[in-house]
Amino acid sequence: MTLATEQVASAIVDTPVAVDAAAVETLSIDAAPTYTAFAAGPGGQSFIEKKLELPKLGQFDVAVAIICCGVCYTDTMYAAMAEGMVVGHEIIGRVEFKGESVTNVDIGDTIGFGYIRSTCLECQFCLSGKENMCPKRTTFSDGVGGLANASVWDSRFVYKIPKEIEPRHAGPLTCAGASVFGALYGYNISPTATVGVVGLGGLGHLAIKFARAWGCKVVAISSTQEKEQDALTFGAHEFICTQNPITTSTKMDYILNTHVGDLPWDIFINLLVTNGTLINLGIAAKPSIEIPYMPALFNQLKVVGSLVASRHVVNKMFEFAARHNIRPEVEEYAMTVKGCREGFKRVTEQKARYRVVLN
């Protein structure tokens, strides 16, 4: 059964915001206040379709019809650990209804959201524009994620998508794009810097594109020789395969590590210039790493992390991507039980070229 628009509004919004009648005809959260979601099965290898109830909107909330959702490697890890969880945090959707205090988006807008669900908005990090570091932040894993056809989200943590960027490309930018751009922006990387990118996957291929557009000399570093041509096509000036003897004379000011597995850390430490910085972006498969101590000491090297990005930086990222025509390479699958299973299998086996999007 499909409810009329007026019924949907009264069901999910305590005080519905009036919308233009012509606009209403283009909006469609079907069968609200229930919606369809795809929950992880045992081991994250399968998915189960389920019906959930949309919560009532708070004053800052928006009800969103989901258009598509990218699949991050982090999603596969959560799906494997938490049976029944609805994962997905690279979400693109269309605003259907909004709470009375929502001012930053309008009904009908295409928006992106997903990794950060909320923060306290009161601590030193929130007040200084670094809310991604808020100790009370909640993330996609604290509720229902984007493998669904609808969602309710705090409008203060959504982003308007530039019209130049298609939804299927915008999804991966909300996390993968934000993560690599956040490192470039947050660590004040100069356009004259030489930047190495470790790993040529979802984050890595975007890191190459963003760093090249940033003006940097870009060195792609991968264990897979077959990815050399792709890396050069994406904008790398040089390619290093770690399975071969390292013969390059190039030293790097920064290395962006997007890889999720164990790595030959001694190789990367020795590729850094004096005072160089290794920035870790991916969720590690192991809880700790071993860094060669003496080279790090005598060359004053830094090993740091970078966690996605603040709202301000995410908006900057979308502006930059639109201006420089930066788009992820995507494989598209239907957002169905079968499509979720196939898409997640591609990501888990690290075969995706280069980001899976469910729509």
Language model regions located:
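Glycine-rich phosphate-binding loop and adjacent beta-alpha segment
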Residues: D262-E329, A334-V337
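Glycine-rich beta-strand-centered segment in the early N-terminal region that forms part
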Residues: E53-C69, Y78-Q124, F157, P162-I165
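C-terminal hydrophobic helical "lid"/dimerization subdomain
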Residues: T2-P33, R311-N359
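N-terminal Rossmann-fold NAD(P) dinucleotide-binding loop
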Residues: G204-H205
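Conserved beta-strand positions in the Rossmann-like core of class I SAM-dependent methyltransferases
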Residues: E96, V219, I279
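Adenosine-nucleotide cofactor-binding segment
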Residues: P191-L200, R212-I267
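NAD(P)H dinucleotide-binding glycine-rich loop of Rossmann-like/cofactor-binding domains
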Residues: Y78, S118-V198
